[in-house]
């Protein structure tokens, strides 16, 4: 429960309070209300709910619906003049985060918080950390792919970083479940829209940066994207940073006065020898490590997670066992066809991750290589040119372009846009299952491979704003082995 007095105190301390308006009267102090629930969904309110009127598309009609359901007061950046009191604020998203934090009893103070950011590798690194910490502790995890609040039950995540009301409710449930640590992926969007406003992480990890999520509804420029990624460093007590990432020198200067550790070839913590399923490291993680996920970049992600978990109480033995046990649904999943050709299913969904995926497969498969690829609609439009550039640099690839969450766009138009950046013919088959079936039918022997990129373990396609059932790349590939 939270009272109106507590609510106003939070807003005033954050310099985010304007006034309470009630029947055209302005109030600096206000009393007589307490709230047992928080909501930003007008369909889920009653007389004891504090309702947040948020979003660029919010309509007064939503508020009218809430009032008919018993709503007595709301918080907003706008007075909708509907006859009930309104708490007016300058920034609704910041208000949501701080009020949710207090309402749920400050659960962040009862958990060790580890956050990963980066253009790619966040989910894999989060899974490595989860398995490392699980050896001696009780970690919860919020990842792009799956969420677990008790370490036993996993459910599909809706956002990389949940809305603040949901985030702190879930954190409180983690505390109730006896969890000791929470591992999170923190997106640039989470900082852009203040989902984690006021939250300080025990360790923040910056894996890498490359142009992505740049478009009309995301970040307008790379500078804006990079800036919002860097906010994790400002909001972490200690940081772990990749020494060979782009703009590393800037980050090194930024974190010079806080606890930090670097990893990678230009640091004291680096991989000295690397095999397909093992590696040796020196520095704080000195030793031998077995790993199931192929690719040097996955070994680097394991190093990043290991250094973070070492700071959070994990032993070297915990880290070794955790790395050896880690598998990630939809990340470098490998199948073998009856003719011994390989099928690789991976979530690679931007130019950088596609380049790394192709390079790993080409190390092991030297025959015919088929690539199945698409790009999402209405987001990350810059990826399309990036995909074309990467494909152009791998002339031995045979490419079939297909649907990948087309949303409100025509998947064939998206494919044509990707194709416009490739200086050789490619095939377009918008039906993703048909594209996979054809690619697999063209592979004949052990040196051949099909690479299915983009959707990973997702069992849906986003079409016209809705999640439409889709069997999943791995399930479809298994069907045609």
UniProtKB/Swiss-Prot annotation:
Its EC number is 6.3.2.7. It is found in: Cytoplasm. UDP-N-acetyl-alpha-D-muramoyl-L-alanyl-D-glutamate binds at residues 42, 158, 160-161, 187, 195. The modification N6-carboxylysine is found at residue 229. Keywords: ATP-binding, Cell cycle, Cell division, Cell shape, Cell wall biogenesis/degradation, Cytoplasm, Ligase, Nucleotide-binding, Peptidoglycan synthesis. Its main location: cytoplasm. One of its GO terms (cellular component) is cytoplasm. A motif (L-lysine recognition motif) lies at residues 404-407. Carboxylation is probably crucial for Mg(2+) binding and, consequently, for the gamma-phosphate positioning of ATP. Pathway: Cell wall biogenesis; peptidoglycan biosynthesis. It catalyses: UDP-N-acetyl-alpha-D-muramoyl-L-alanyl-D-glutamate + L-lysine + ATP = UDP-N-acetyl-alpha-D-muramoyl-L-alanyl-gamma-D-glutamyl-L-lysine + ADP + phosphate + H(+). Catalyzes the addition of L-lysine to the nucleotide precursor UDP-N-acetylmuramoyl-L-alanyl-D-glutamate (UMAG) in the biosynthesis of bacterial cell-wall peptidoglycan. Belongs to the MurCDEF family. MurE subfamily. This is UDP-N-acetylmuramoyl-L-alanyl-D-glutamate--L-lysine ligase. The gene is murE.
